[in-house]
Amino acid sequence: MLKSTDVRLIINNRIKSFTGIAQDRIQWTNQPNFKIPLEGLWCRVTIQYSDSQSAGFFTETLERDYGIISIQCFARKGTGDAALIALAQAWRDHFHHYRNGDFEVTMTNAPTEAMDDVQGDFVMSLVRVEFRVN
């Protein structure tokens, strides 16, 4: 049975194996000293858990966890969105049907069309990767 620390390692390793953008352009959750690039694309990755459910009773209860990896891809306003959408699609392809032991991606949502970011300097495309553990 995988624990949350095991799952985090699996997800982190999968993100690190992505070659669609340089790793120094990926902002991780609670990453210190990340600098938003002045030019070009960059991404922000967050991992959120949702409900847990009892999936079976053997010698102990098996808990099945669910979660979402949110990958926000950013481009500065006025630079076009073709490369942005292509990057988001590459992330989707990278996670599509990915499985590692008891970790399984159950759905990769199509990237959203580019939309304004709340900061106002960027347009963003979002990829949601839904997963199940155990």
Placement of each model-derived feature along the sequence:
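Oligomerization/assembly interface segments of phage tail-like spikes and tubes
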Residues: 62-77, 123-134
